């Protein structure tokens, strides 16, 4: 909800490409978070469908992030047709695998869990980990673009660097969730994006745009 609420603020950016990128990140992440929340609220077969739609929204966040990072750092990858077509092909291929999961079950399966509360637990399969690995690699490419920009900037970008670091915290929680039953095994990335968005849009907006 925080990401969706921040969209009007992002729409005020003058640079059209940066505006499209950050709005895309906020929209995709907001939908991702909403579907994740809905997954724990509803019950029955619809829960699996909601989780599936959330997965697609989450993967879409990666591509919106790359578009934003390319535009914000002054690169042109987001304008190149070959890059656009290749990105679309990869995205659609992964979406197809996710949509057909009810048939092959290689992306995830479900089971009833009772700890720390009763919910429909997700057991991730091989395809999930492959796509998750790809997502982390692509996200890291975007992070590299930002860190390189801030490193070469004449401005004091330390607060912005800290904000970027917030994006990595949920990854630590994701890993911890694999090792302890006290944490639900879901992707916590939307929390990091929400923290980053609040920081760049409401706390350090001028510095963010000045760089």
Model regions and ranges:
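Hydrophobic alpha-helical membrane-embedded or membrane-associated segments
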Residues: 24-28, 59-62, 136, 140, ...
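Individual alpha-helical transmembrane segments in multi-pass integral membrane proteins
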Residues: 1-2, 12-104, 129-132, 186-193
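Hydrophobic, aromatic-rich alpha-helical transmembrane segments
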Residues: 48, 52, 125-126, 156-160
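Transmembrane helix-loop junctions in multipass membrane proteins, especially transporters and channels
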Residues: 41-45, 73-76, 102-110, 150-157, ...
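Extracellular-loop-to-transmembrane junctions of the mid-late helices
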Residues: 94-144, 176-186
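Interfacial "cap-and-anchor" motif at the non-cytosolic start of specific transmembrane alpha-helices
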Residues: 4-5, 33-34, 38, 147, ...
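Juxtamembrane membrane-water interface segments of multi-pass membrane proteins
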Residues: 9-15, 72-80, 144-159, 208-210
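First transmembrane helix
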Residues: 1-14, 23-27, 132-150, 196-204
């Amino acid at each position: 909800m925080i990401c969706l609420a921040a969209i009007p603020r992002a729409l005020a950016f003058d640079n059209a490409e940066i505006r499209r990128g950050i709005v895309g990140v906020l929209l995709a992440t907001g939908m991702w978070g909403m579907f994740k929340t809905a997954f724990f609220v509803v019950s029955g077969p619809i829960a699996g469908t909601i989780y599936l739609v959330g997965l697609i929204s989450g993967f879409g966040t990666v591509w919106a992030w790359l578009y934003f990072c390319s535009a914000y750092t002054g690169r042109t990858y987001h304008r190149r047709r070959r890059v656009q077509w290749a990105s679309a092909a990869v995205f659609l291929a992964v979406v197809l695998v996710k949509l057909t999961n009810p048939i092959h079950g290689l992306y995830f399966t479900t089971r009833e869990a009772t700890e720390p509360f009763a919910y429909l637990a997700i057991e991730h399969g091989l395809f999930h980990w492959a796509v998750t690995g790809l997502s982390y690699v692509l996200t890291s490419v975007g992070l590299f673009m930002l860190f390189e920009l801030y490193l070469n900037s004449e401005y004091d970008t330390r607060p912005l660097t800290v904000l970027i670091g917030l994006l990595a915290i949920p990854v630590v929680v994701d890993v911890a969730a694999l090792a302890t039953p006290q944490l639900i095994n879901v992707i916590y990335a939307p929390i990091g994006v929400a923290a980053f968005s609040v920081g760049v849009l409401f706390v350090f907006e001028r510095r963010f745009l000045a760089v």
